[in-house]
Amino acid sequence: MRIDIMTLFPDTLGDVLCESILGRAQERGFIRIETHQIRDYTANKQNQVDDYPYGGGRGAVMTADPLYRCWEAVCDEAGGPVHTIYMSPCGHTFKQADAIRLSKMENIIIVCGHYEGIDQRFIDECVDEEISLGDFVLTGGEIAAMAVTDAVCRMVPGVLADPECFEDESHYNGLLEYPQYTRPAVWHGREIPAILTSGNHEKVRQWRRKQALRRTRERRPDMYEKLDLSSKQDKKLLKEMEAEDA
């Protein structure tokens, strides 16, 4: 998979996207992440990429031409139109399901806005979807682009050592992840749950499932309401939870 990120600040992306899991995945050829300086596609000596907004108002708006030239160059290299995402507080909220969906694409482009945003005409002509990280505003799209890139890439086959690395994680299966513990067994007087050192893998699995259900119910009731808890095992765990809470 290849992800091309269009930005005014490519240096802010490199260190994060080339380290750890993503760095190793790029070295092994599972993913490729490229950044593109939008200023390189301007047609003026000042490399100006913004102008005053029509209708007045504070700030500046990124102009469509350099964005389009950059986008066109990336698409030409890919051999055709590429699914294009604009990071925007006006977009739909990014979910784990989006990460899974996008990870199945061969190429995507992520456009990072700045200032007061980008000319709507570029969005209308070139952007396939707008994505937001949540109900807040960032100075630019770079931080959001890094988050989306990381979430998408780790879903690409081969990037993580085993599917089990993400199958138990929060949001993948509609649940928040169960609590995790490591050595020492006692820290500041707090002991780990005894079940985790029992050696009984099935009981550990059931305990983790129960903790994930409990955590989701308490912290994300909106997610909990959507769960299918009709299995015999889940019904048993729910009864145990009710007894423990009584």
Across the structure, where does each feature detected by a protein language model lie?
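N-terminal nucleotide/polyanion-binding subdomain common to many enzyme families
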Residues: 1-74, 202-225
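Short glycine-enriched loops at secondary-structure junctions
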Residues: 38-41, 114-118
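Structured adenosyl-cofactor binding patch, chiefly the S-adenosyl-L-methionine
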Residues: 122-169
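Internal, active-site/partner-interface "lid" segment
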Residues: 143, 155-195
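Hydrophobic/aromatic beta-strand patches that form the interior of the parallel beta-sheet core
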Residues: 4-6, 34-36, 83-85, 108-109, ...
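S-adenosyl-L-methionine/SAH cofactor-binding core of RNA-modifying enzymes
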Residues: 63-114, 120, 157
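SAM-dependent methyltransferases
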Residues: 184-246
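Short, solvent-exposed amphipathic alpha-helical segments in soluble enzyme
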Residues: 20-24, 100-104, 126
